Amino acid sequence: MQLTKITGRLPLFAFIMLMCASSHAAAQAGSLDPTFGNKGVATAPMGAKAIAIQSDGKIVVAGAGVSNSQFFDTLLRLNTDGSLDTTFGSGGIAYLTPPGAGSAPLGFFALAIQPNGEIVAAGATQTEQGGYTNFVQVALVESNGSLDTSFGSGGFTAPNMIAFTPYNVTGTEALALALESNGSILVATSYSNLLVRFTSSGQLDTTFGNGGIVNLANQGPNTSFAPTQIALEKNGKILVTSGGVAPAPLVQAGTISRYNINGSLDATFGAGGTAACVASASALLVQSNGKIVVAGSLTSKLNAPPAGNDVGFGVVRYNSSGILDKSFGSGGVAVADFGTSAPLSGAFAVAIQANDEIVAGGAAAQGALNQSFDSAFALARFTGAGALDTSFGSGGLVTTTLVSGSSNVYSYVTGLAIQTDGKIVAAGNTAVDQGFGSGTGAYVVRYLAQ
């Protein structure tokens, strides 16, 4: 009788186990994480430019936002489940503005978290000094979202660096940021193309370059190149990428340069300190083995079409000497083809997983060239050898449509981060009519890694 009862339960037990196994199998790498936000997606009333993950797993997003009809430098913090962290700022959002009359914040464009949990964010502020002029701004924010007033002036530093700009431009913005091991802060700026070092207290570090400022190599008025990212090698040397559209032919291109700790160009890297890049060099990281990974937009998979509109994902790897790593991809270059030739595809962010696999994030156009201005969040994952990881998404590629039912919706990833459990967190934005219409806000999306 007892044997009969046990045998009668076996089919139900087997069915439950089968369902569990099927559910696990369905959760493929690259799938949205259903435990985060709303089915893997969290939204925020701001524009997102950068993302970082704290040691406790909370997610910080930097950008710009509007509160009470005023524009602010904005930080957002999410709990690990994608909900707003109400212990941060006002209900999870910190709206910040630099002190001083006539200063208007333009937003944060870069972000890093110090070992003590304080947040460093960099961007730009606009002043009315002889007309509207943009200045670099760096802010130090306490873990509760309030400004650390011991830093700079009231928590912000925004030095006037126009005298250092090499091309007679009238302003500058911080686009990239990195923290050195001694607490110093490195910032790379647009328009003026400067590399700037601040002390941990927010002052220009006069031991670096010329009074704390270095004019970046291979930048000038004949290109649209601008600094995009900073990364530090284990020995403290400084890598800086710049990218844009080369003037002739019109193709996506970039450079990567290396600087010594004192700000001098490291002539042992590449050709005299700089290496060329076939991609727009939008993002930069250093792998655990010292190899250098650059991700960006690639024109026509290395062949320039008319007007340079055919753009895709490109990941380029260099040895530590600045020479292309020919063991990676095809001659050092790996390409992700999302099956479209519209001009809105490209990689803008990169992250490296614990196993040294590379995740690139950006936008994938949802239509043919000159026929659609729609794009989706896009990820591509590459193995350490530069091949697409076919266990991820569909053949190594993932696209996520965040806004449906509208036309000309441009969705794109601006930042990537990897959690300690390997999950991939992407931050980005959507905009209607390529950003010339109304925006729909920021999105933070979490993907399963395995």
Which residues does each predicted region cover?
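Bacterial N-terminal signal peptides that target proteins for export
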Residues: 2-13
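Extracytoplasmic mature domains of secreted or surface-exposed proteins
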Residues: 2-3, 20-450
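Bacterial N-terminal signal peptides
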Residues: 11-22
